[in-house]
Each structure stands twice: as structure tokens, then as C-alpha cells.
From Swiss-Prot:
Heterotrimer of A, B and C subunits. This is Aspartyl/glutamyl-tRNA(Asn/Gln) amidotransferase subunit B. Keywords: ATP-binding, Ligase, Nucleotide-binding, Protein biosynthesis. It catalyses: L-glutamyl-tRNA(Gln) + L-glutamine + ATP + H2O = L-glutaminyl-tRNA(Gln) + L-glutamate + ADP + phosphate + H(+); L-aspartyl-tRNA(Asn) + L-glutamine + ATP + H2O = L-asparaginyl-tRNA(Asn) + L-glutamate + ADP + phosphate + 2 H(+). It comes from Acaryochloris marina (strain MBIC 11017). Residues 475-494 are annotated as: Disordered. Its EC number is 6.3.5.-. Pfam families: GatB_N, GatB_Yqey.
Amino acid sequence: MVTKAPAKTEYEAVIGLETHCQLSTKTKIFCNCSTAFGADPNHQVCSICMGMPGVLPVLNETVLEYAVKAGRALNCEIAKYSKFDRKQYFYPDLPKNYQVSQFDLPIAEHGWLEVEIVDEQGEATRKKIGITRLHMEEDAGKLVHGGSDRLAGSTHSLVDFNRTGIPLIEIVSEPDMRTGLEAAEYAQEIRRIVRYLGVSDGNMQEGSLRCDVNISVRPRGQKEFGTKVEIKNMNSFSAIHRAIDYEIARQIEAIETGEPIIQETRLWEEGAQRTIGMRSKEGSSDYRYFPEPDLTPIEVAPSLLKQWQSELPELPAAKRHRYEEEIGLSPYDTRILTDDHAITQYFEATLKAGASAKQAANWLMGDITGYLNNESLSITDIALTPEALAELIELIEANTISGKIAKELLPELLTKGGSPKKLVKKKGLTQISDAATLESLIDEVLAAHPQELEQYRNGKTKLQGFFMGQVMKRTSGRADPKATNQMLAKKLKG
């Protein structure tokens, strides 16, 4: 079986994503139970989220606010009138035997999202992906299988209802994507947006963001869609990319060998790097939707819509564009700096403290990010403040210290914090830039190595690095590298 989609083919894939985002509310969508992650099983439930007789749900107003803000951030039209519906199906993790969702009148429709693909040369291409709808719904519980990570092969299954009733927004895209790379980037941009808005943490490992892929393959140029297959169980953006590439190759091979493609739901197996059949795919009629009688319809007042619109922050795409146009950063740099909202905030605070954009970007994307990755930390975990980073950059640009000395100071600043200026003074690391002092040092080094000096003047010019190293050794790295190198070159020529 081919496991990677061919780069060139007479077929094309048609891909759409359904993205579920858990909203970062303190309580569930229709009751006051906590939404905190990691509680003991079945300790965050009540008669409402468990669907006991005689209780009535009440919509959490923050859920509506977050849904509207997400809808506007995705350029959607906000419905003047929407409602909740019951989506009916039987599964052990659904205590009411129906899920409260939205069917024909969702809160937001007809939006779009622009994704940016940066190639290996750092060049960016942009593509607009349509958003069909965004709707609110409640999450189901979680099945825990004994003896296996899924139902097949398990010895028993347990149900944790803590997740039941946690508020979700489901974002349904148009089938505008054609590759696994585009789909993975679309999903990442959704996560960036909900994180910038503060409506979801977008944590895929904890299930706060989940993506289902709908994919079909057709001959290039054909307008009709092929048979649609849904893929589930992808817990990273790279898994989305790989699962789609695999499924494209599988469907192309099936078409070329005459094997029928059935409409079904398939699971991505991370270990085997393949999709496997799970069940036949249901249609909307199978769920027997009907209006939720226990919840009133939703009408968003124009004044409230205007207020929520005014509270939207600068979003990732706008920020990337500003960084490129106003600050002059490359598409690659802007992509890295805007991927994590916390790093974006740190970067902007560093600029506000007076640092140059390019230097701040280099430090953040280089040594600081390397440290964070090695230590599995977030930018919010370090002791180095944005103001201190700006101060460190100022010391380098003023030739008070060299970049090498700054890198040596960084580990202590990251773990203990404090003022770089005070640390440099305390350790006696101020850079030596005085011409007379440097000239004296160079003369001493040349006098101490007459043999190497003769070899240099006989054509072995690479020895300049040796002499430079000797000066740095005598000054413990404090000699101004640029000034030292220039003066050394003149002295060596005699």
C-alpha cells in the first residue's frame, strides 16, 4: 500500500474539516458543574448534565459570547435568530441518549479563513478557506477501555461523565482544501485564533481541540465529488497531515484497482501509520434532529453584538501582515512569532521596552526557544522579563558586551531573572573597546608567538583566527570582536 500521496496525479482530493473546540468557561454549558480538567472520574456531574427527570437546562451566557466572538473572528455572519436541537443517538457516553446541538439555525454561517503556507525558502502563499457554519453544542462523556486503547480488543469499558455538558463550538469548513498540508495549516490557524480570543486553550492532547476530516478523491477537473470518508482519532497537526496523505493514496489505489470506496468513518492508527474502518457513516436524517423544547431560541441584541465585536483582539493573520509590512520581518519569522500567543505578547512587550524587532525576534526564535524546548517550558515559565531582554539587547548594541558574553549570561537570566546591566557589572564582563587597550593586548599576543607570526606573514593567513583566540583568552572573551579583528588584521600585515 502506498503511504504517501503522490506529488503529481490525475486525481485531486477534496477535503473539509469539522473542528470541535472546548470553550474555556468555568462551568458547563447548561449547568454549574466545573469544567476543570483532571478531576476524578464522575466527580463533576449533576442531575442536569446527567439528564435526570424534572430538571431544566439554562444556557451559560459566556458560551454564547465566546461563540459569537469566534464566529466574527472567522468572518461569519451572526444569526439574528438561532436555536438548539436534539441530536439523537445511542452510545454509552451520552446519558440523555441525545446531544444538545444546533442543526438548521446555527449561531454563525458563511465565513472564511485565510491560511498561509510557508515553503522551505521562507516564501508564503495564501489561500482562503470557506467556513460553512459555526454552532454551539455540549460535549459527550469519555469511554475508558480496559486492555486496549479502543473498544476492539478491550476486556471492559468504563464511562467518565465529567466531560458531559462541557461547552463546544463546532467549526465546519467548506471542502476547499486539497492537501494534507493545507488541512493541517487550517487546523493550526483555528487554534491560533481561539487562543488569541481566549475562548479555548486549543490543547489537542487534553482533547480541547479535536478535528474530524472528510475526504474524497476525484479525477482532476471533475465537478462531482467522490465517495466521502470521515477520519477520526488524530491528536496532532502532523497526524492530520499524515492521515490525509495516507487516505488520499489509499483511495487513489482503490479507484485504479476497481475496489469500491464506501462511505464510512475510519480511524487513524498512529502506530501503524494507517487508517482502518470503524463504522458506516451516518447521515443527518439518522440523528432525527428536532428543536430542543427546554431551551428558548437565541436572539443576539445588536448592542451586544457591537460590544463583543469591539472586544476582539488583533488576530494572527493581521498581526503577521503588520510584522511583515511595518517591522520588516520575513514570513518565516512572523509565522514563528505569532504561532504561540504567549510568545507574541512577550515579543511585543520586548519591542515596547525599546528593543529592535530583528534582534528581539532572533533571541526569541533562537536561544530562548531552544531553552524552552529543551526544558519543556512555556515562555511564561522563565524569569527573564521582556524588559530584561530589551536591556540585554541594548548592552550588545552599545558594545558594552559581546553577543558571546550575552549568550553566556542567558541561562542565569532565564532561571534567576534580574537586571542584565547589574549582572554584567557584578561579574566584570564589560566589553573592552578602548583602542589603546586593544592595541596593547594585540602587541603582547604577537610578541608571545613570533613563530606563528612568521608563518602568517609567509602566507598561512588562517592563523589570524589563532591570534584572535589568544586575545579573547587573555580577556576572558571581553575584547570587542569587531574592533579586535580589524586592528589585528592591520598589525599582522606589519
